């Protein structure tokens, strides 16, 4: 039979040890703490990703919308009375061709470039929505369509007449409403045809603007 003195010696020498129950309880407590910390880390990472993607998406959509609106407003530039439309025939809900008679000869020549304020300009500019990219091509300047922004989830052109009603007649178009929806272009979702999941930084920025064609 062990005496109290011998038990005291064992404790002083660090040979008391732990019971299996104590060890399991300690491991369970550590596991709970680690699970909580992991949850906080994942949540913080997702929140940061959403915020960063939101900023990027807003900037991309804003730049693209402003660029298109500016060029739509300036379309139709040319000598007074020239018989050409500011937007070429065949416009659709996701593409349009803007026209300007930069050399002033009264006709639109897609293969001709003109020096305008020190910059070569083509007489047609095409905007189109392909896949997840907004494409722009300037005739005589760009050999092929150039991506303006990526991460585009939707693009819609709506054509309006002088009375503000929608029109499909090219010669009657006086304004164009442009609606763009996009996400970040530096990352792509696991399924490009579906919206981002929250874990991927789910964002979707939508902007809309109506541009009045000043030369018509």
Predicted regions and their residues:
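Aliphatic-rich helix starts adjacent to a transmembrane/signal segment
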Residues: 2, 11, 16-77, 191
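Short linear sequence signals and composition-biased patches located at protein termini or domain-edge surfaces
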Residues: 2, 6-8, 102-104, 141-216
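Short capping/connector residues at structural and topological boundaries
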Residues: 6, 47, 53-54, 92, ...
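Short, glycine/small-hydrophobic-rich surface segments
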Residues: 49-50, 56, 72-102, 168-171
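Aromatic-acidic/polar surface patches that form glycan- and anion
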Residues: 57, 61, 127, 171
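Generic detector of solvent-exposed, compositionally biased contiguous segments
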Residues: 63-84, 146-162
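Type IV pilin-like appendage domain
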Residues: 88-165, 202-204
